[in-house]
């Protein structure tokens, strides 16, 4: 197959690692090619079907291994649904992470894609951080898969308890505004949440976790995501529209839990307990960007702390993209996993599709492979010429 030959011929990376213990280059970009993974909300029924049909030798054993590791037929749930069961946090999150790694395995095993040679840095949006750490070699796939499953069960229980105690719905809502209004919108939100106190959380000691709202994600130059009680979120929107001079477009997200908010404290505590140094390899094959610092993890303890805090802290996605784009010299961006949300967020920020030696690609179904590998090969040659 000509496409497989193209994959095997894929050139080695251009540029050198430059993050603590990695050699740097003064003449070439240091983190030129980024591999990124999607987060919660991209799950859909049947999202493995085309992959199994196109690449049964790789995908069938991979999905069987997933079921064995989790001791449940998650592959059947992904294929057949029902979707309301797949959407449960404890199912959606391991499904998304596993499918993301499966697609990467297809590239490696069917097309000879050499991740360690072709990629300089990995990152993932929220849940996607786990796939990024697996791809870079910090966590093993079996450990990460079970970790995500258990974490998802705890997160689901956190939300159920909050609903029972308050009688309210919990979830996440994106606020979209003009780029030049984002800073003042964030300031207005923070002022409402914490009465001017520094930070994105409502830090009032008199407010229970279920009454709090957090800025869960800073996604782009014109979008943040709020997480928590929908009643409290609606009150916040009324306040900033009446008194803050803002009227952002509000979009409820495909999430039945308030991720990255104080109600997820039990998930943070679980992560701190089970994510021990012996389960983390450091250094690994390449840097991975932390969601909570928007910089590469610097040590085992930094990784353990950052990955644990991710459950309750803001995901600094926009800052991560800006760091790689403006400071680390990243010009090529490869998204791997279900859905196109991650690619759209990256494309909106870096706008590199037409730049010589740069571009943004994503692989979410088999038809994406050929144009992606060709684009990566072409831009590697352009940069070398």
Predicted feature residues:
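Alpha/beta catalytic cores of group-transfer enzymes, especially the acyltransferase/condensing modules
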Residues: 41-42, 136-310
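FabD-like malonyl-/acyl-CoA
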Residues: 20-198, 332-385
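Acyltransferase
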Residues: 246-336, 340-347, 351-370, 379-385
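A short, flexible low-complexity segment enriched in Lys/Arg and Gly/Pro that occurs
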Residues: 13-21, 98-102, 310-317
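N-terminal chloroplast transit peptides
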Residues: 1-18
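A generic secondary-structure signal
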Residues: 106-110, 239, 323, 327
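Glycine/serine-rich loop-strand microenvironments at binding/catalytic pocket rims
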Residues: 1, 175, 179, 217, ...
């Amino acid at each position: 197959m000509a496409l497989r030959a193209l994959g095997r011929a894929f050139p080695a990376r251009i540029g050198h690692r430059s993050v603590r213990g990695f050699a740097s280059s003064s003449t070439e970009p240091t983190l030129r090619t980024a591999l990124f993974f999607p987060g919660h909300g991209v799950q859909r029924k049947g999202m493995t079907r085309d992959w199994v049909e196109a690449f049964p030798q790789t995908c069938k054993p991979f999905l069987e291994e997933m079921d064995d590791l989790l001791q449940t037929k998650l592959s059947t749930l992904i294929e057949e649904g029902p979707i309301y069961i797949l959407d449960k946090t404890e199912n959606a999150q391991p499904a998304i992470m596993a499918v993301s790694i499966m697609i990467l395995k297809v590239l490696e095993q069917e097309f000879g894609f050499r991740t360690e040679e072709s990629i300089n840095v990995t990152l993932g949006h929220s849940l996607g951080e786990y796939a990024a750490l697996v791809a870079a070699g910090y966590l093993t796939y079996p450990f990460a898969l079970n970790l995500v499953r258990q974490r998802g069960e705890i997160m689901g229980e956190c939300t159920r308890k909050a609903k029972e105690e308050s009688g309210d719905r919990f979830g996440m809502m994106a606020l979209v505004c003009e780029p030049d209004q984002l800073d003042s919108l964030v300031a207005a939100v923070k002022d409402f949440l914490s009465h001017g106190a520094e930070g994105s959380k409502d830090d009032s000691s008199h407010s229970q976790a279920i009454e709090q709202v957090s800025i869960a994600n800073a996604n782009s130059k014109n979008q943040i995501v709020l997480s928590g009680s929908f009643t409290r979120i609606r009150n916040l929107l009324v306040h900033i529209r009446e008194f803050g001079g803002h009227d952002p477009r509000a979009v409820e997200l495909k999430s039945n839990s308030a991720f990255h908010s104080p109600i997820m404290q039990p998930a943070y505590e679980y992560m701190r307990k089970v994510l021990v140094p012996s389960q983390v390899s450091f250094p690994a094959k390449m840097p991975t960007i932390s969601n909570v610092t928007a910089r590469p993890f610097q040590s085992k303890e930094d990784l353990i702390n950052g990955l644990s805090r991710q459950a309750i802290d803001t995901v600094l996605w926009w800052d991560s993209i800006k760091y790689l784009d403006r400071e680390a010299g990243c010009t090529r961006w490869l998204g791997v996993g279900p859905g196109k949300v991650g690619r759209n967020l990256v494309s909106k920020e870096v706008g590199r599709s037409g730049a010589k030696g740069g571009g943004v690609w994503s692989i979410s179904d088999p038809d994406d492979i050929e144009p992606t590998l060709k684009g990566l090969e072409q831009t590697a040659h352009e940069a070398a010429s």
